[in-house]
Every structure is written in structure tokens, then in C-alpha cells.
Regions:
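Sequence/fold signature of self-assembling virion shell proteins
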Residues: 2-18, 23-25, 30-33, 53, ...
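Assembly/oligomerization interface modules of large self-assembling protein complexes
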Residues: 21-84
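Short, flexible loop/turn elements at secondary-structure junctions
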Residues: 54, 92-94, 172-176, 273
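Extended, low-charge hydrophobic alpha-helical regions
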Residues: 78-98
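Short, solvent-exposed loop/turn segments at the edges of secondary structure
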Residues: 81-85, 165, 264
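Alpha-helical scaffold segments that mediate packing/assembly in large oligomeric complexes
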Residues: 91-162, 289-297
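Extended, solvent-exposed, turn-rich assembly/linker loops in the middle of proteins
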Residues: 128-207
Length: 297
């Protein structure tokens, strides 16, 4: 008996399309947010000046002997903002063939993600630029190295006081965290710079219930990023105080949608942000070098 199947009725079948998926980027900002951030107001210059006063020295005195005065000379660092942007262009005919409102929202999300990644990659060069280094290329990251960074910053020529030590942050790659996690939460064997005592049950439950750092190490939170500067299989992570660097946001994200060229019958969608960044105090940060080869066990 003749039968009709889906193989015969092809022109009446509706095409089924799900919601578009977005290509993900590591667009969180643990690096940028770790530095001192200044945001300009309307009417301000695109160059930010950050002056600094020197310290003075107290001396013992002898009765009846005049003490000598000191000359105060200030210093300054300046950061000039430059534009960073991303743009895409669509024909109006193409937009008419799709759900254009949803498409434009997705494009806005993708462009915002791209700007965040660019910020992170830029400020990662500040971490790579610290003059003092903990860790070693080709070797796994250790808790001892983080502890060394904390100690060096506390004893720096311009030392961080106890309150400032509480503002430190460390940023490492997922591979570096893999090595650190095995030291922070040991199974009972192997060398570790962390105490080998078993963590309380509630701490273990909270720690192992989610991926990544869940707290801090002696007051220093550990963040993960894949936007750190790399050199082969090695990565330039870091531990630093916010005042080690300055991020100046002259103009926040400005998004526009406009006719690119009427004769092209197209629409341009763009996003621009204006910022600058620079090192403020090299002694307030430590570059953390370590092997970041993807682990297999």
C-alpha cells in the first residue's frame, strides 16, 4: 500500500531553530578590579595625575641645639586614556530575516565581553611588569611562594601595614590553582607548606562543593584568570596591593547603533571605552611565575 512519509513532505515542514548560543570568553575582571580605579566625571581631562608626597625622617635631638629641616619634594605619575572599541555591521535585509531585537542583544553581550577581555589583557601586563618575582618558570605554583610574596610585601622598603596586607589579592591560572589546591587541602601524604591537619567537616564540604578558590590564604583571596600573560607553558600570575597600579576610566562603555552608509543599506553597531593604566608602585606587587601546563591528574 502506498504510504506518505517525511521523505515525501519536505516543503511544508517548518524549520526549528533554538535560541542562539554565545561563544564564551573569560570576561570576569579579577585583574583590572585588583588595581586602584579612578573614574572621570564629565568635564575632566583624559589624563589623570596621581601625586605622591615623600616621607620624612625623625632624629634624636640635643638640648639647645637647633634641629635641621627637610625639603619636601613631591612626585607624580600620570595616566592618559586611549580608546578601545569593537564594531560590527549588518545589512538591513539580513536583520529583517531574523529576530533582530534578540540578535542585537546577543551582539551587545558579545561586544561587552570582548571589551572586558581587552581590559584584562591590558592590565595583565602590569602584573607581568613587576620587578620582583616569586616562583619559577617550569615549576608548579606552591603555597610557599604565595606566603613569600605576602612576606616580601609586608617587609618592602615602603612596607604595607596590616590593614593594607588585608587588601592583597592573588590571581593565578586554573592550572596553577590545581597545584595550589592539592597543597591547601592535602589528602594526608606529600609535602605541603600548608598545615597537614584535616580541615573541619563544614570547611571541607564548602570547599569541595564548588570549583575554584572559596576563601583566602591568610587574608589573601586567590582569583582565577586565563587572561594572564603567558610565555610558552609558563604564566605570569601575581600577588599585589591595589595601589601597585592605576586604572583610569575616562569614559565608560558607550554603545551606539547608527546607519554606517545609507547607500550600503546597512546598520553599524559599535562599542567604545576610553581608559588608561600604569604602574604606580612596583614594590607593592610581585610577579608570580609558574608552569601552567594543563594537568592530567
Amino acid at each position: 500500500m502506498p504510504i506518505t512519509t517525511t521523505a515525501q513532505i519536505t516543503n511544508l515542514q517548518e524549520k526549528v531553530i533554538g535560541a542562539a548560543r554565545l561563544t564564551l570568553k573569560d570576561d570576569q575582571q579579577p585583574i583590572t578590579q585588583g588595581f586602584h580605579i579612578e573614574r572621570a566625571n564629565a568635564g575632566q581631562d583624559d589624563t589623570f595625575n596621581w601625586p605622591k608626597l615623600p616621607g620624612v625622617t625623625a632624629f634624636g635631638l640635643s638640648e639647645g641645639v637647633d634641629m635641621s629641616s627637610e625639603t619636601i619634594v613631591d612626585s607624580n605619575m600620570s595616566v592618559s586614556a586611549t580608546e578601545v572599541g569593537v564594531a560590527v555591521e549588518f545589512t538591513r535585509k539580513m536583520l529583517r530575516t531574523i529576530n533582530s531585537a534578540r540578535f542585537m542583544r546577543n551582539m551587545g553581550s558579545a561586544m561587552g565581553s570582548a571589551v572586558n577581555v581587552k581590559k584584562e589583557q591590558d592590565t595583565a601586563t602590569l602584573v607581568d611588569g613587576f620587578g620582583n618575582v616569586i616562583g619559577l618558570d617550569g615549576s608548579p605554583a606552591t603555597i610557599g611562594q604565595l606566603s613569600a610574596g605576602q612576606t616580601q610585601l609586608r617587609a618592602n622598603t615602603e612596607p604595607l601595614n596590616s590593614a593594607m596586607i588585608g587588601q592583597l589579592r592573588a590571581v593565578v591560572t586554573p592550572a596553577m590553582w590545581h597545584d595550589l589546591a592539592q597543597m591547601l587541602f592535602p589528602t594526608g601524604s606529600g609535602d605541603s607548606h600548608a598545615p597537614m591537619t584535616a580541615p573541619p567537616a563544614e570547611v571541607a564540604s564548602r570547599t569541595f562543593s564548588r570549583y575554584g578558590p572559596t576563601g583566602n590564604y591568610f587574608g589573601t583571596p586567590i582569583f582565577l584568570s586565563t587572561n594572564l600573560v603567558a610565555s610558552g607553558n609558563n604564566t605570569r600570575g601575581g600577588v599585589w596591593h591595589p595601589d601597585a597600579g592605576l586604572f583610569y576610566e575616562f569614559m565608560p562603555i558607550d554603545m551606539y547603533t547608527d546607519d554606517s552608509d545609507k547607500s550600503l543599506r546597512s546598520l553599524e553597531m559599535g562599542m567604545v571605552v576610553d581608559y588608561g593604566f600604569g604602574e604606580a608602585n612596583d614594590g607593592f606587587g610581585r610577579e608570580w611565575d609558574a608552569d601552567s601546563t594543563s594537568p592530567t591528574s
